[in-house]
């Protein structure tokens, strides 16, 4: 019979000296220093403890055990002669009188060294994820995730939100990302879908009379992976509030998130309420993106008019010219060229540059085309000697994007322009309700068609009557951004069927189209719905930020790879002909 452990491997201290204890864990390492003398590192979830083998009997047992086997050790605690101040248990060691095998590792060689697993090939790490997770550094990310979710749940309950789970099997919503479909055995030819988000259900809860809802919601989208996006499955802090405005949502988020970021983050500084706010169009103008990183003090400025008439082709009439002035820049020509090449790869458009010399003259890059406009440019940009000016030129959207990428890279490269060790939140507001479609050339919804338009029905009717330009209509939508990463989108919902119909009329759709897109929600709203608003910050992205990781896969216990494959479990995989027959499915693959 296995003896229960009396302590964990991270627990023993000098106060336990002379106690008889039983520990259990993985045999991490063995260092033999004599015929009957060895040091063993025993590891469990809580830490490591040094075991000192001093007898022939114990040495013979240890010699027959492979690393990463699980063992039980019973022995006496004593003070270490050579202490390790870096280790919590570094002042003690255990001298064993009994060692039992619990779970044998049958392999002499491991796929990778446990404590250096992050250096291994990612495919190997995912294939042997259970070994990868034994690495304390990897394991700590999962512990962090658990703590953050617990803190989010506690905070939401304290704000009088009810945690309500919503269905996992639901109807397909093809207007969003691709759905994961689930065949319905009892209904041949029909399919459920895994929810891309609990959007309609949470709005139906508001219509049902619930006042404040939340859940740590699993969401499923068949989309490609990115560094900050896991394919397949992700989780979000989903919330909705009845009889609420944008300000009510902001108030809750600004109260809930900063303490959690300050407590659990790599950096212990997080912006407090109220968060900075910026309109969508202003964000594009000043930051070159709708995901502004306020830690960087550089701002983009428009110099189109200042360089009018320039002989430089990219500055030609009809193009937009943007500038970023970065003072105190000591980058060499080689580094500047590398910077510009990196910007072009990321933005897809070529940037330009010049510098201000000690005597105030312009040099390098496109200096000869800027010199004729010297005084005006110096005054407009507030230039001083040693300043590097990044230039982006082209169509407005291209110039904004290129300048935005260059701004971020300069902020990270040039000392003094980025306060990296903090979490800086901001709200992006006043998104356009409509846009001209690139392919159709006609008016289309810009983002969420079910958001409440600014000005409500009256604004829509004026647009339909031709009294105002529909492109000037803003939606009551908002994004939550932290350190240049979008954590969530949210909105004040359009809860009025009449306003919904007016909003769709502008894009040449009618009442039947509204009903077809969301029949249950539309019908529910016809029975009297409260004004409501919500948001859903991504849990995975929050934890990634808090852990200081660049890849979202590092904070997910069992992530898929970039190709949406679960290498560990072999998913997706084939199924039997009998299973397919029961589901009335025939697989036809083009060879």
Q: Model-predicted segments: where are they?
A:
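Class II aminoacyl-tRNA synthetase catalytic cores and aaRS-like
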Residues: 1-591
């Amino acid at each position: 019979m296995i003896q229960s452990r009396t302590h964990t491997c991270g627990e023993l201290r000098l106060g336990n000296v002379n106690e008889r204890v039983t520990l259990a864990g993985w045999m991490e390492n063995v260092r033999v220093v004599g015929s009957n003398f060895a040091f063993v590192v025993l590891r469990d979830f809580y830490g490591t403890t040094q075991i000192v083998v001093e007898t022939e009997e114990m040495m013979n047992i240890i010699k027959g055990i492979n690393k990463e086997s699980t063992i039980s050790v019973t022995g006496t605690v004593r003070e270490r002669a050579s202490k390790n101040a870096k280790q919590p248990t570094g002042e003690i060691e255990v001298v064993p009188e009994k060692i039992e095998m619990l779970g044998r590792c049958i392999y002499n060689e491991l796929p990778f060294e446990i404590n250096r697993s992050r250096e291994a090939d990612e495919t190997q790490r995912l294939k042997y994820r259970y070994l990868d997770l034994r690495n304390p550094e990897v394991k700590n990310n999962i512990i962090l995730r658990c703590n953050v979710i617990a803190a989010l749940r506690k905070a939401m309950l304290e704000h009088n939100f009810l945690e309500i789970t919503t269905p996992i099997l639901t109807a397909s919503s093809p207007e969003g990302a691709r759905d994961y479909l689930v065949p319905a055995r009892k209904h041949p030819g029909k399919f459920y879908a895994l929810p891309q988000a609990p959007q309609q259900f949470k709005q139906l809860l508001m219509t049902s009379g619930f006042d404040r809802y939340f859940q740590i919601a699993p969401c499923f989208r068949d989309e490609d992976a990115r560094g900050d996006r896991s394919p397949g499955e992700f989780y979000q802090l989903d919330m909705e509030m009845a009889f609420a405005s944008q300000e009510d949502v902001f108030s809750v988020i600004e109260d809930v998130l900063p303490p959690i970021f300050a407590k659990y983050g790599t950096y212990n500084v997080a912006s407090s309420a109220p968060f900075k706010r910026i309109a969508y169009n202003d964000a594009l103008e000043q930051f070159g993106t709708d995901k502004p990183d306020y830690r960087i003090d550089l701002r983009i400025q428009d110099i189109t008019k200042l360089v009018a008439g320039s002989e430089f082709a990219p500055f030609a009439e009809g193009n937009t010219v943007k500038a970023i002035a970065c003072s105190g820049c000591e980058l060499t020509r080689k580094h500047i060229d590398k910077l510009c090449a990196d910007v072009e790869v990321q933005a897809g458009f070529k940037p330009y540059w010049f510098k201000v010399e000690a005597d105030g003259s312009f040099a390098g890059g496109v200096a000869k085309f800027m010199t004729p406009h010297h005084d005006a440019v110096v005054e407009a940009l507030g230039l001083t000697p040693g300043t590097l000016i990044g230039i982006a030129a082209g169509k407005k959207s291209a110039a904004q994007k290129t300048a935005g990428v260059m701004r971020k890279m300069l902020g990270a490269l040039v000392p003094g322009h980025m306060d990296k060790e903090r979490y800086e939140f901001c709200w992006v507001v006043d998104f356009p309700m409509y846009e001209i479609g690139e392919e159709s050339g006609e008016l289309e919804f810009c983002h969420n068609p079910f958001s409440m338009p600014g000005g409500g029905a009256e604004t829509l009717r004026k647009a339909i009557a031709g009294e105002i330009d529909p492109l000037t209509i803003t939606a009551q939508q908002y994004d939550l951004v932290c350190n240049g990463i979008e954590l969530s989108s949210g909105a004040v919902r359009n809860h009025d069927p009449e306003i919904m119909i007016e909003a769709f009329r502008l894009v040449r759709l009618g009442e039947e189209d509204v009903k077809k897109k969301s029949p249950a929600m539309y019908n529910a709203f016809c029975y009297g719905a409260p004004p409501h608003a919500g948001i859903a910050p991504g849990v995975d992205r929050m934890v990634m930020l808090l852990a200081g990781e660049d890849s979202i896969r590092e904070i997910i216990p069992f992530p898929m790879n970039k190709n949406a494959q679960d290498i560990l479990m072999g998913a997706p995989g084939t199924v039997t002909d009998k299973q397919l027959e029961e589901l009335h499915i025939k697989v036809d693959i083009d060879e």
